[in-house]
Regions:
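Conserved catalytic or regulatory cores that recognize and/or transform ribose-phosphate-containing ligands
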Residues: 1-98
């Protein structure tokens, strides 16, 4: 079983939309990897009210460092945080799934 980090656009989406996209990402990742995955919880529903974007990115990169693979959801290219996560995965040899 591989540990899976999911990078996805979240701005202007409801919690329900985010969760639905994550479920789809998990199914695609399982097909691509050919095995079950343990999802790393990078959806910060209980983040501090005054948390800035850089706070979220720092937490995400910390979690990404523990991943066996990273899935990049549709539209990731248009979001700064997702692009930084992608660059980190690429530079540190974490397999990327799309």
């Amino acid at each position: 079983m591989k540990k899976l980090f999911i990078s996805q656009p979240m701005r202007d989406k409801t919690n329900e939309q985010i969760k639905e996209e994550r479920e789809k990402a998990v199914e695609i990742a399982k097909q691509q990897l050919g095995e079950e995955v343990e999802v790393i919880d990078s959806f910060f529903e209980d983040a501090p009210h005054d948390a800035k974007p850089l706070w979220f990115l720092a937490k995400s990169l910390e979690l990404l460092s523990t991943a066996d693979a990273a899935f990049f959801a549709k539209g990731w290219e248009g979001y700064r945080g997702c692009r930084i996560e992608h660059t980190a995965a690429l530079e540190y040899g974490i397999p990327r799934l799309f």
